[in-house]
Structures are given as structure tokens and as C-alpha cells.
Amino acid sequence: MVEMRKLLGIIDRQGDIVMEQALGEMIAEGEIHRYLKKSLKIYEQRRDDCAALLQQYLGGHIRFQKPSGGLAIWAEWAAPVNLSQVSKICARSDLFIPKTILYQNRNITAMRLGFGDLNETEMEKAIAILAKAVSDLAR
């Protein structure tokens, strides 16, 4: 099978002709452009929803700016917070916060909060759990 793929690669340098034809038609008919416009509106709404929820639940604890692009918000904590502890507390409520989105040193405590794959209900649940974890840690 591996040898056949190698031979096919040598013979057919052009790729998948049917796929190329289909994509060409989609571009010519404006399908890609319509999908892009629709996607941008969805992600802008998710960004706005996330920013509003962060302000509502964590407004006094974090600073952030709505990004003009991308699928995440960089949130800096106003006061130092032990992000490892926050992550552990959130895990008790089934909210997994990977260490790769946490940033902490002597001068800054921040998180990269992604919103691209969450709907408003999921966002609100996650941010509420995060806010409760911060509140519990402050006690």
C-alpha cells in the first residue's frame, strides 16, 4: 500500500482533480465568501458574549481588551492569583484548564481564554465556575 501511494505521488503530481474542481466552483459561485462572512459574524458574536460574561463575572478581578481578531481573550488578573490552585478548584466542577493557557511570574498573572468553540451557555457556565474558584480561593 505504501509503495502504491509513492507511485501515485510520482504519477499524479496535480492532486485530487475532483476536489480541485469542486473548490473552484465553490469559489466562483461565491460559496466560500458567504461562508466566511457568516463565520466572521458568529465569531464576533462569541467574542462579544465572552467579553460581556467576563465583565459580568470577573470584572473586578481581571483586565482585558476585546481582540480585533483571533479566537481568545488575554485576561490579566488585577491581583496575583495562584492559577494552579484556580485550575484545581475548577477541575472539581468539571472545568479543565490546561496549564498551557496559564501564564504567571512575579510581575504578571494572566490566562488565554478561548471562545471560538463555545456557545453562550457553555461560556457562561465555564466563566461562572472560574469566578467561583477565584472567590473560593480568596476565602
Language model segments and positions:
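PLP-dependent class I/II
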Residues: 1-139
